[in-house]
């Protein structure tokens, strides 16, 4: 049984549509779409704990982390389920997303349905921060402010 989900991201100047598809429980999830209005460069991209945007993106809570691990990069074994690394916005402020992730699940007990997808202002350091940035790096990747977010919702097959 395959699953299709969507997140419509909104922020003050940033917007986008992200689609999720998973063929069966335990298989990788494909994450694709486009986000506009970003500053050129790298931006942290994460699934957050709550599907709550009542107080903007801050209501989304911390990164989705059902296994209580430290923050890491998308290819690290030690990472939050929600750690999707960085997306890249071009000179026009548009980021094209095409990710396949084995940790993000649409089916099963740790589904991301109803949780929030957040894009951040800054580059995610992937848990590799040093010195006075190390503690925050292991929680958030020092990715900065939340510039847009949306709730992962059920969508029609596409």
Curated annotation (Swiss-Prot):
CC per GO annotation: cytoplasm
Location within or outside the cell: Cytoplasm
GO molecular function: copper ion binding; superoxide dismutase activity
Residues annotated as binding Cu cation: 46, 48, 63, 120
EC number: 1.15.1.1
InterPro entries on file: SOD-like_Cu/Zn_dom_sf, SOD_Cu/Zn_/chaperone, SOD_Cu/Zn_BS, SOD_Cu_Zn_dom
S-S pairs: 57-149
Cofactor binding note of this UniProt entry: Binds 1 copper ion per subunit. Binds 1 zinc ion per subunit.
Amino-acid positions noted as binding Zn(2+) in the UniProt annotation, renumbered to this chain: 63, 71, 80, 83
Cofactor annotation: Cu cation; Zn(2+)
UniProt keyword annotation of Cytoplasm present: yes
Quaternary structure and partners: Homodimer.
UniProt-recorded name of the protein: Superoxide dismutase [Cu-Zn]
Species per Swiss-Prot/TrEMBL record: Brugia pahangi (Filarial nematode worm)
């Amino acid at each position: 049984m395959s699953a299709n989900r969507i997140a419509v991201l909104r922020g003050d100047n940033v917007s986008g549509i992200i689609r999720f598809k998973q063929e069966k429980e335990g298989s990788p999830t494909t994450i694709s779409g486009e986000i506009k209005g970003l500053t050129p460069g790298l931006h942290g991209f994460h699934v957050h704990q709550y599907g709550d945007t009542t107080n903007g993106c801050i209501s989304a809570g911390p990164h989705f982390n059902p296994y209580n691990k430290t923050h890491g990069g998308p290819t690290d074994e030690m990472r939050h389920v929600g750690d999707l690394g960085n997306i890249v916005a071009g000179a026009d402020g548009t980021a094209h997303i095409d990710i396949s992730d084995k940790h993000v699940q649409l089916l099963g007990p740790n589904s991301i349905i109803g949780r929030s997808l957040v894009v951040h202002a800054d580059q995610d350091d992937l848990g590799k921060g040093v010195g006075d940035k190390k503690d925050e790096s292991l929680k958030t990747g020092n990715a900065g402010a939340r510039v847009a977010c949306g709730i992962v919702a059920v969508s029609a097959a596409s």
